[in-house]
C-alpha cells in the first residue's frame, strides 16, 4: 500500500513539474528541484524525494525523475540561504566527462562569502599545485519548489571514488585475504560527527570518512587508528627529524607542502580544524587534501581578524596545527616550505589566481546581481569582517588580500627557516673590508702593525685584497700593498706562544706566515682568520672598542666560534 501511495505521489509531482517552464535565470545553468508534495527540507539527516531539471548554458533541459535531497553543513545549515546534498538513484556524470560519475553531489550556498567564489578559487589553487583531487566548482542558479534561492555552487561530495579521492576501494564484504592497508579517507573534524576517534598524543579529532560508517569493520578501524597513533608517536619522538626513523618516512612531502601552503595563503582559520587526508592501499604514506570549506578564509571572519599578517599555525583553530608546528622545528620541513613556496610564486601562482578571480567575476556578474536582490549584499550572515555596497568591492578586497598576504608570507616563512651555516669564503677580484664581530670596526694598519679602526668610507688602509694561493689566501692591504703576516717568534702551535701583534710585510707567496685560512663559523656569516704557520687565530686584544687596538696572534681553541674577539665579517 505504501509503494502504491508513493507511486501516486511521484506521478502527481511529475505532472506538476511538467507544467513548469524550465528556463535559465541568467547566463549560468539553472537547477530546478521539486520535492514530492513540496515537502520542506528541514533535516541534515533525512532525505526527501524529489525531481530535478538541469537547464544548461545552451538551454538544453535534462530531467532527473528520481533523486533525494537533504540539508548539509554545520554552521552553514543555520543560515537562511542553506546548503544541500543531493543523491541520485543512479550514478550520474552531472558535470561532464572530466568529472566524477557519482550519486552524491553538493549544492554549496556560499552564504557567508559575499564574493561567492572563495571555495572555487581555492579549488583552482589546488589544481595549480600538485594536489591530485580538487572539488568541482560549477556555478548555477537554484530554484527549489518554485522559489528562487540564489547563486549556488555544484561541487563534489568528499568521498572515495574515481575522479574524487581516487584511492583503492576496499573489498566489500571483507575476505580473509583482503588487504586492509587502504584506501582510507580521513578528516580532522572538530565537530566529531560520525565514526570518530581522538588521537592520544596530540588530541586530534579524526573522522573515518571511508570506509563508510555502515561498511567499516573492527579490523579496519583498528588498523587505521593504530597507523595514525604510530605516526604521532614518531612525530613526537626524539628521532622525529631523522629522514628514516622520523615522520618524513610517513608523509608524502609534496602534498603536505602544497596543502599547508594553500592553508596559509588562504589564511583559513579552520584549516587545522577541518582537514582531509588519505592513505592508499599498499602505500605507507599519508597524503594531504582535498582542499575543502574555505568560505571564511581570506580574512573573512571577525573572530580572527588581521589574518593578513598571521600564520595559521599560530592563529588558527584546530589541533592539527600541533603536527605542523612540530614539523616546523625540523630544518628539512622549513626548507621544504620555503623552497616550494618560492617555486609556486615563480611559476605565477598569484597572477593565476587574479586571472581566475577576474574570469569568475565576469561569469557570475548577472547571477550575483540576482542573488543579492534576494539576500542583500551588505547584510552580515555570519562573521564577515567587511560589508560593502557593491559586489566589485568584495572582489577587490579578496584580490588585495591575496596580493598583500602572499607577499607577507615570504618573510614569515623565511623567518622560520633555520639559519644556514656560514659558507666557505670564495674570494673574488674585489677589495674587502674585514670587520670585527664585537666592535664592528675594520681591520686596519698603523705603520706596519695591524690594528682596528672605525669603519670609514674611503679609508684605503681598511681595504684588503684576498688572493688565493693554493689551499690558502694572502690578505694584502690596498693602501700599503703589504701582506698580513704573523711574526710570532719561537715555538708555535694552537695554544703556544700567543699574543704577538700581527703586522704587514712585503708579499711573499712562499712564506707560510702570510698564508691564511678563512674558517666559517656559525650561521651569522663570520670567519676566523687562521694562520697556516703558527696555527693561531687573529684576535682583537682584550675586546677593546678603542681605535688602534692591536690585533694579536692568539689562541686557537673551542672558543673560536663563540668569542667575538676572534670573529670577523668579510
Which residues fall in each region the model found?
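Conserved oxyanion/phosphate-binding beta-strand-loop segments in alpha/beta enzyme cores
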Residues: 51-109
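Short, well-structured beta-strand/strand-turn elements
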Residues: 129-141, 268
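Lectin-like carbohydrate-binding module/patch detector with strong preference for beta-trefoil
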Residues: 422-570
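Middle-to-C-terminal accessory/interaction subdomains
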Residues: 28-29, 39-41, 63-67, 75, ...
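Short, solvent-exposed loop/turn and secondary-structure capping segments
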Residues: 43-45, 96-99, 118-119, 152-154, ...
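Internal "kinase-insert"/substrate-recognition segments embedded within catalytic cores
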Residues: 87-93, 102, 107-111, 131-135, ...
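N-terminal module-boundary/linker segments of secreted carbohydrate-active enzymes
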Residues: 20-58
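Bacterial Sec-dependent N-terminal signal peptides
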Residues: 1-20
